[in-house]
């Protein structure tokens, strides 16, 4: 387990399942994550993801990207600006550039958690999707299916709570006897740290944070790494793989999801007015030059 400092006990969380979010939601809660009426681009992104995201593929990608490229040096704000031209094709709730979503998430968190002791939480909201830079020309425009969308464990049976579950039937791992039992290649309650997740922006940016020795607390790293793992934090699935540490962090991941999902708005954000605050947090938690 990667050691990081923890700044706030999980008992301090104000998680509220009633969805009294503390910030304005621009549409009905039931209208979010509506995949039945989503555009064709959304189902196509998941068709490709569920077909091509195999255990071997994800293992190879993690090995490739964990060796950070020292020739790519870029600050977090510069990375965020790369998202100006990127649309997440797997997202039925947003068709605006990703930098707007990042700042909408961060500002919603900041409204509910204004105290400076939660500044790490504000920053997490801003940076959580920066792994989507993989879609940019700077990173050779990696395919959407290998970058965005809900994440899921590989090396074990696909759970039916996964969105567009039927597409997994085209995945080579679906009928592989090594992988199609409940635990597959893993021991029960092995812990998510030891589970190979589908490859994408979550896992990639987690590797960037850890590889650059950022100063974010453990709660933040869990949010970054598992915010797209909806079968776990929304449907309480795959608990046969989680351990005590994962369960301690689950409420934080759920709390983050409230802001990540329900703060989405088609109205653009005044990026320049917010830039000084988030740059100050970047300097605090990412003091070193960043490699990607």
UniProtKB/Swiss-Prot annotation:
A Gene Ontology molecular function term for this protein is: oxidoreductase activity, acting on single donors with incorporation of molecular oxygen
Localization per record: Cytoplasm
What residues does substrate bind to?
33, 88-90, 132, 149-150, 227-228
Q: Which residues bind Fe cation 1?
A: 101, 128-129, 260
The protein's matches in Pfam families, at most eight in alphabetical order, are given as: MIOX
Which pathway is it part of? Answer: Polyol metabolism; myo-inositol degradation into D-glucuronate; D-glucuronate from myo-inositol: step 1/1
The UniProt keyword set, sorted, is:
Cytoplasm, Iron, Metal-binding, Oxidoreductase
Signal peptide positions (record): none
One GO term of the cellular component aspect? cytoplasm
Task: Name one process (GO BP) from the record.
Answer: inositol catabolic process
Q: Where does Fe cation 2 bind?
A: 129, 201, 227
Question: What is the protein name given in its UniProt record?
Answer: Inositol oxygenase
Q: Which organism is it from?
A: Dictyostelium discoideum
